Amino acid sequence: MKRLDIYPARPFIKWVGGKTQLLDDIKKILPRDLSRRDEMTYIEPFVGGGAVLFWILQEYPNITRAIINDINAELICTYRVIKHDVENLIFELNRLQNEYLPLNEVDRKEYFLVQRERFNERDTSEVETAALFIFLNRTCFNGLYRVNSKGKFNVPHGRYANPKICDEETLRADSAVLQRVEILCGDFAQTGKYAHDNVLFYFDPPYRPLTDTSCLLYTSPSPRDAHES
């Protein structure tokens, strides 16, 4: 059994570079007395899919506060909606799931492209944005997040027989864990002001492209709110 499987809260999306498979190795390099330290704060400047975040907050209940950050505004919007409005998010995801799953392959691709265009128009509510973010992640090719030079999400449709678009149990468990998490969006350096003696930082920055011609952009300039929740 993988270390994260024993807990209900876990990553709500697939994410390139996610650390679910490495949690045992990460635990080995944590301070040996971490579980005995009172009122710890955990800070993750590049949260991504949150595998370490969700695991460590369930493994170490003495970590009473966490601060996460990411420069990807749509990802952070999704974290905030899960924290503050998870039931409306579940409602919207169930709607997308119920519309998508009965379709044949051709119609699924067309439906995917329509939702991708909605997402790229950036004219949706926060709940709709979060739902589209998760829907696209669950139905696109390999769960990639990639945007072009204009900041448009451009990953093609994937071919999955029965993707789990709305995982209600995980979303509710994640929402419960996120109640003790402060959520920031922007440059990772802003987390430095929270450093003090009882803080554990975990750094896992995004990967650089393999070549100069690679177009695997993690984010792009966005008008979305970049202030803390």
PLM regions and their residue ranges:
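Short helix-terminating capping/connector loops at secondary-structure junctions
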Residues: S35-M40, N62-I63
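Conserved proline-anchored active-site loop of SAM-dependent methyltransferases
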Residues: Y42-I56, I68-N72, I134-F141, G186-F188, ...
